[in-house]
């Protein structure tokens, strides 16, 4: 009988019920995959992510944990707004249709979700809570509004957080980001900078790479803030530096375009720079304009020119730098461009300037290139010697740092400072499809929070997307409202929250049955025990979520600082790329068709699956052709979860063959499998029968049936023990390898004489494959007479007595050449071992011609003739 995966999978998907259990012996286990944006279709990356989490959830449930394994939808965002404009539909309707489609797709994979906890962030009963959070953050001083220069995406027509700018481009649109000055709402993530940094070390089950990325993004720097007097103005320029010892090598200062000083110097040149400037500029060009101002050097009788430069960021430190071109690559390039002095001050620095400098200085135009060995941070050491530096001459760098700080503090123009690269999170977005910010602006009362009893502030449905910009800002009625204080006409805030606001707390909403934030439920289920998602979220989502936990704890919602205990960053699903003779990207099926027609195509490298390069495979196609279990097994089989995996049609075929092989094997052995009690309990209680211990002279020959079965039983239980350990440590590909090995082992057993062992092996095997291929496992469970659902059965435990090695394999050599192997009792007496070895090769050697026999216990016997 052939395995009918289509009917089997539908049958069990309609009957599974993964409601959260109560009072489980092992306590809670919260498993969560990063929830998806409802684009309308799942892709292979989704499939891998969700199946990894599903295996963990099913295993933990079998181990007796109260498993929370929810799913929801990160439903706000610009794509819905774009779809509304392009297709003349409401974003809510477009989003709901996509959610319905994707929900059906997820159910077709057989994922063990607590569907009763499903949520969507675009629903008012969800986002009303985050509006309340915002009001509480206001009370706690964690929110403020100010006018600031922001990153403006000209394609998406909205503000981007710095974390959303990648190499000067918008993270979603890819457009070159511009600078604009707007009034924005900010969350004070910097209040928790030190705590966010320190607590990284306690996240023992996070990948080191993720922790390193967050460490660098928070960017703690210990240095000095120096005040430079601006010549001709009664103002001072504050500069933060981690290298005060290079102050005598300074040849210029530079400020960011947003610096307050610049606002007083709005020459046409500076205005042109501001209007055209990009973050770091195209190709990281260092662009600057001389302001016409100079600053006084703190110790020398000279002035340094003050520039406005595009590489200086207002958000970082003081928005100003002093440039030491001899010991900084960026400053060197700027000095070359603007012909500024280059003054070396550290004798053993490995920054080579061409032509060589004899402890003097050159201007930028005289220097043709630099040589940097081993990277900039290694250009000099703390033991390098200072020169060209007045009172620092002859000191080591380490000594010079201390002395220069003391001198600056004595003069009252410098102080030790700790700075962070991290800046406050701007959450205002100029778009419709997002959570409304609950604030009202009144000409009499100023900024007024929406009263809690008036929450939620919901979105209007009668909006116009055809005129561009933010529809809320142009709405004829929604925008206008009476002030809660004076009752005069006022206006709503028309910006909406950054969508990362919603995803920064959704894991807490899942803890409660009604999607609210129940303190007891949150403290009970949080933190998330296993969080699975891509490493691309290492800074944005994960850092914001850590901040939100601290902010919500401060507001009294729960008492959890860290949201995620174990973080699994699954690798990408990759596929070979194809192009036709004209360089046009081809879908794999198109490439296959052209090849069969004899056409020439270009086979490219293996890359992450992407729509743009057409190297995608539709999960629905695989599920329809091979079944959900085949798709699940393939994405888990050959590659550790954290590594990228390559799509392979042969691999999919191999997984399909295994599933059918397992079905046929169990059907073959079905008549001998008798379940008198819970088979899993039967397996767990199995011990070695006394007669199985018997052997002749320590050897287990093939004719000794019970002895042979002892070996099989040991291997099965060792595989069970090993794969259980692999599951505990998320080595899922190793689990697959072990249960495949177990399958082959059971298939070798003689059905006539090994009925009890087959019964035991089949019971173990069906249970351990269930987290991976649950539909087939449930079907096999039913076929062998199992009662109820398999996923509700406990996990089998390997018998400890079967894990002890009392038999070893010994090599038998004749004159140094391997001729046989034998299985003998461990630590067998050497004389017995020698005799067994001679007997095992009796067809190869005449015992009367044996001159000597040498034996190493438990390892080898060498017969010399």
Curated annotation (Swiss-Prot):
Residue sites binding ATP per the record: 611
Cited PROSITE patterns: AA_TRNA_LIGASE_I
Keywords: Aminoacyl-tRNA synthetase, ATP-binding, Cytoplasm, Ligase, Nucleotide-binding, Protein biosynthesis
Catalyzed chemical reaction(s): tRNA(Leu) + L-leucine + ATP = L-leucyl-tRNA(Leu) + AMP + diphosphate
Entry-linked CDD domains: Anticodon_Ia_Leu_BEm (cd07958), LeuRS_core (cd00812)
GO (cellular component) term, any one: cytoplasm
Location of this chain's protein in the cell: Cytoplasm
HAMAP family named among the record's database cross-references: Leu_tRNA_synth_B
UniProt record similarity statement: Belongs to the class-I aminoacyl-tRNA synthetase family.
Protein name stated in the entry: Leucine--tRNA ligase
Lineage: Bacteria, Pseudomonadati, Pseudomonadota, Alphaproteobacteria, Rickettsiales
Gene from which the chain derives: leuS
